[in-house]
Amino acid sequence: MSDVPELIHGPLEDRHRELGASFAEFGGWLMPVSYAGTVSEHNATRTAVGLFDVSHLGKALVRGPGAAQFVNSALTNDLGRIGPGKAQYTLCCTESGGVIDDLIAYYVSDDEIFLVPNAANTAAVVGALQAAAPGGLSITNLHRSYAVLAVQGPCSTDVLTALGLPTEMDYMGYADASYSGVPVRVCRTGYTGEHGYELLPPWESAGVVFDALLAAVSAAGGEPAGLGARDTLRTEMGYPLHGHELSLDISPLQARCGWAVGWRKDAFFGRAALLAEKAAGPRRLLRGLRMVGRGVLRPGLAVLVGDETVGVTTSGTFSPTLQVGIGLALIDSDAGIEDGQQINVDVRGRAVECQVVCPPFVAVKTR
């Protein structure tokens, strides 16, 4: 018997294979990485619209009297700033200030909060909440109860309108609707930096919604897009990916996610540690790197000033939009590195020149 855990298969795998997708493991799931090619899918999303199957994302439900109050006492962001029909980016931390996961919390009612964590961390988030929950609250892992389909790009509203789905929500708002008898939660969220939506139909009915979206996306000049393009798109925005820019060893402050912490709240997981880190100043900070010459950055490369190592890359890719190599790196705060400064990255023993920049690398168009 193999000790390697079997990969989880999404509800739309057969459709992806018919579309010619290539697949890879991500977060324990077998997911489509590309169809026509990552660059083509990336550019289609920036200029028209891309359709992503991100059903590997987690889903969980906190339900019972005072569910919102409990979630607000556990996760970092201030849930009291939103209400029903709104969603919020937030983090689930350890008591030492590390990040178990970053996730989206959907405020359904005072007694019901729907969560979308990352694929590999869903069980850990559910477990942390269950361990702290008072009696009368249920925290349920619904990972394979819903699919998640992302429609991203400047033509995304046209696509949803063609299906008769709601589009009028503000950024981070959501509405419950239906398509052809299938209930769908439609959210004004995304991970690309473009105007877009994420749709959550039931797992078993996802194909009906996907087929209709694909036809409308094609009519709008777009194409299906895989996780390869999703990664290049999020890297251009400087968005963190758990396991790269956030982890049990990388705090929200180090990843420049302090804006997602409700510092005035009385309680959240890791509050004391994060307040202490905020007072002292984080020892390292996430920065952007833009290559001066040719090449591609990858995670885990040393960032150098002269012969001194001052940081490490966390993500890197070729930017189809800018036609240059870009990356993200954690750089020591006491190194005194300023935006615009030239540094080097050790790429296979060769010092490659990069410019330190403040992400995003391209303009944000989410709103």
Curated annotation (Swiss-Prot):
Transferase in keyword set: yes
Q: What class of enzyme is it?
A: transferase
Domain of life where this protein originates: Bacteria
Q: Does Transferase appear among the keywords? A: yes
Q: Which GO terms describe its molecular function?
A: aminomethyltransferase activity; transaminase activity
SUPFAM superfamilies to which the protein is assigned, alphabetical? Aminomethyltransferase beta-barrel domain, Folate-binding domain
Please name the GO terms of the biological process aspect recorded for this protein, alphabetically: glycine decarboxylation via glycine cleavage system
Q: Which UniProt keywords apply?
A: Aminotransferase, Transferase
Q: Which reaction does it catalyse?
A: N(6)-[(R)-S(8)-aminomethyldihydrolipoyl]-L-lysyl-[protein] + (6S)-5,6,7,8-tetrahydrofolate = N(6)-[(R)-dihydrolipoyl]-L-lysyl-[protein] + (6R)-5,10-methylene-5,6,7,8-tetrahydrofolate + NH4(+)
Which EC number applies? Answer: 2.1.2.10
One Gene Ontology cellular component term attached to this UniProt record is: glycine cleavage complex
**InterPro entries in alphabetical order:** GCS_T, GCS_T_bac, GCST_C, GCV_T_N, GcvT/YgfZ/DmdA, GcvT/YgfZ_C, TrmE/GcvT_dom1
Function recorded in the entry: The glycine cleavage system catalyzes the degradation of glycine.
How is the quaternary structure described?
A: The glycine cleavage system is composed of four proteins: P, T, L and H.
- Name the PANTHER family on file: AMINOMETHYLTRANSFERASE (PTHR43757), AMINOMETHYLTRANSFERASE, MITOCHONDRIAL (PTHR43757:SF2)
Miscellaneous notes for this chain?
Answer: Was identified as a high-confidence drug target.
Give the similarity note: Belongs to the GcvT family.
Protein name per Swiss-Prot or TrEMBL: Aminomethyltransferase
Organism for this UniProt entry: Mycobacterium tuberculosis (strain ATCC 25618 / H37Rv)
Recite the lineage of the species: Bacteria, Bacillati, Actinomycetota, Actinomycetes, Mycobacteriales
Q: Which gene encodes it?
A: gcvT
